[in-house]
Amino acid sequence: MSPKEEESTIRNYSHSFVDRKGEAILIKKLDDSMHQALIKKYLAYQPRDSFEGLPPIEDEACVKWVWKMIRDGTNLVALASEGDIVGHTAIFFIDRQRCEMLTVVWPQFQSRGIGTELVRSSIHLAHEMGFEKVWLSVDAANLRARHIYKECGFECLSSGDRGDVEMALDLKGQHEEEQ
């Protein structure tokens, strides 16, 4: 795929599905018109500081953090049928082979399959972008997220019941299958 085709694929990415409660959910690339809505969602997120110190507790720090994700990442949002953001995932460049992934589903929309679809969408985009490995860090106590990541093929690089657990997904096999 040429860089132009790759960018077009990423820019136009969208995926819709029906969640476990029967609601239509659209996952699409974050566009300029949604930046303020994403910031407002993170400012309203409760409890703040609930996953690895994120979102930041102080409003100013939270806004800066969201802008950094918008600027530095490839961002997807999950939208409910009325257009409200119910989840967010981002891929961040580490180096030519590796990227980092962050995924958040707002608490009232958890356990509906949205997180799993966001993770799968990020994996798809990371693959399309040519990355060989997706890395993430998750709070050891966040068993729901750890289950989703394992279900999507991630393997634990570290373990424990306290602190953070590092996980990674090797995409190299997927690249070789295409050739």
Residue ranges and their predicted role:
Residues W106-Q108, R112, A140-A141:
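Active-site acidic-Proline motif in GNAT/NAT acetyltransferases
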